[in-house]
């Protein structure tokens, strides 16, 4: 059916291979979409890649996706923009700290539930805290997948705001801090640990079969 066809395109087993390149490649539609979207919402101009021009420059030759020569500069700008967005947005210290705090909040909720301590959780979110779910569970239980795709930022923030007033101090403090943007701090470790460093370097040289004349 249609779902089988979509899966074949995504995995690259469909005979028209350019569909896979459009869906999942270094120059796919998803990357163009999220770069423009995230550039708009974060105000980072470097992510504005001119996706419409790139799409107009795309063609299919021998079942492969190709780019017109005059579109190469736009593709180069796309690759540079993606790298800049990772450093300025996705790997920014604020993003990393926020993500870590959300994970710690969820870990704390699971710990409390294991101790039979009540935590108010929205129904379609609770299923992910009450049991350990594997990839196979998603494949075998349609209800799990439906619950997952129904979640959005509003559900997560609603739960976190409720947990600000929980009796557990750890959960309450974490929830209050992320709500009030009092985020974790990144601590940089100064100084290079050199113990065993030379031995590791030599071992890597040997593994890559680099001649000894180049090792010093």
Give the location of each predicted region:
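Histidine-centered, transition-metal-coordinating active-site segments
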Residues: 1-216
């Amino acid at each position: 059916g249609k779902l089988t066809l979509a899966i074949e395109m995504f995995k690259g087993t469909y005979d028209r291979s350019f569909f896979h390149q459009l869906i999942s490649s270094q120059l796919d539609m998803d990357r163009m979409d999220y770069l423009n979207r995230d550039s708009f919402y974060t105000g980072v101009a470097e992510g504005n890649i001119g996706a419409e021009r790139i799409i107009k420059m795309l063609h299919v030759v021998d079942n492969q996706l190709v780019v017109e020569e005059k579109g190469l500069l736009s593709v180069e700008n796309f690759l540079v923009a993606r790298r800049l967005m990772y450093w300025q947005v996705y790997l920014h210290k604020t993003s990393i700290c926020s993500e870590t705090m959300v994970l710690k909040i969820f870990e704390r909720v699971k710990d409390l539930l294991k101790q039979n301590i009540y935590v108010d959780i929205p129904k379609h979110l609770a299923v992910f805290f009450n049991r350990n779910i594997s990839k196979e569970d998603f494949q075998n239980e349609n209800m799990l997948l439906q619950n997952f795709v129904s979640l959005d930022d509003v559900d997560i923030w609603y739960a976190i705001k409720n947990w600000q007033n929980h009796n557990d101090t750890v959960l309450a403090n974490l929830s209050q801090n992320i709500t009030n943007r009092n985020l974790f701090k990144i601590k940089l470790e100064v100084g290079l640990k050199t113990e065993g460093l030379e031995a590791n370097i030599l071992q890597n040289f040997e593994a890559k079969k680099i001649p000894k004349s180049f090792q010093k």
